[in-house]
């Protein structure tokens, strides 16, 4: 069994925020693969199903971003999952819109959701970093991540979440590079990434 965690803030006020692209990604995985209806538990919401014959639980912490680790720790403890069984889908300022990277371990790059998870679970979980772009200067970061995607951005956001969901089964077999390549190729085909943007790096 594996756990895929989408990061975000709960409630309609935050639903379309850039900071909530992790929620959007796991919502799409649940929808496209016929997972169970979301239900409240573990200080979050869960949906369960199967990807490539592997049982997967999706978790959206409802603790607010800064306390995400509490929900992840509670769910991981209940299912007896190790840190290596956890994959976190997060927004990433340092990647251009629509690009992603997959990495096990590493720093938190100022991301409060990752900081909380690392404090509660350790650092060696897998991160799927979903690019939202940087506003250009540090002072604008807070407002950038907590503002909604513009209407003009939604086509690439939806395409990214769909490609992540379509290829999520590759993550159950730790085929991270293949997953990243297939997602990037899907966005290229729709004109959201240039050909030079493909690849897992």
Swiss-Prot record:
GO terms for biological process: protein quality control for misfolded or incompletely synthesized proteins; rescue of stalled ribosome. Its EC number is 3.1.1.29. PROSITE patterns: PEPT_TRNA_HYDROL_1, PEPT_TRNA_HYDROL_2. The record marks 91 as: Stabilizes the basic form of H active site to accept a proton. InterPro entries: Pept_tRNA_hydro (IPR001328), Pept_tRNA_hydro_CS (IPR018171), Pept_tRNA_hydro_sf (IPR036416). It catalyses: an N-acyl-L-alpha-aminoacyl-tRNA + H2O = an N-acyl-L-amino acid + a tRNA + H(+). SUPFAM superfamilies: Peptidyl-tRNA hydrolase-like. TRNA binds at residues 14, 64, 66, 112. Signal peptide: none annotated. One of its GO terms (cellular component) is cytoplasm. The keyword Transmembrane does not apply. This is Peptidyl-tRNA hydrolase. It comes from Bradyrhizobium sp. (strain BTAi1 / ATCC BAA-1182). The gene is pth.
């Amino acid at each position: 069994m594996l756990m895929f965690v989408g990061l975000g803030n709960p409630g309609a006020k935050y639903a379309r925020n850039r900071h909530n692209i992790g929620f959007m990604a796991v919502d799409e995985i649940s929808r496209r693969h016929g997972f169970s209806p979301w239900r409240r538990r573990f200080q979050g919401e869960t949906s369960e199903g199967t990807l490539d014959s592997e049982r997967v639980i999706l978790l959206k912490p409802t603790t607010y971003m800064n306390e995400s680790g509490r929900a992840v720790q509670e769910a991981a403890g209940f299912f007896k999952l190790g840190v290596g069984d956890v994959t976190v889908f997060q927004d990433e300022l340092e990647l251009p819109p629509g690009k992603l990277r997959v990495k096990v371990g590493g720093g938190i790059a100022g991301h409060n959701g990752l900081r909380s998870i690392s404090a509660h679970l350790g650092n060696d979980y897998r991160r799927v970093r979903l690019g939202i772009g940087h506003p250009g200067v540090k002072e604008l970061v807070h407002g950038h991540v907590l503002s909604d995607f513009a209407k003009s951005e939604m086509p690439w956001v939806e395409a990214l979440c769909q490609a992540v969901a379509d290829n999520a089964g590759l993550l159950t077999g730790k085929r991270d590079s293949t997953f990243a390549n297939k997602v990037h190729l899907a966005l290229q085909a729709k004109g959201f990434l240039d050909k030079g943007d493909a690849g897992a790096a």
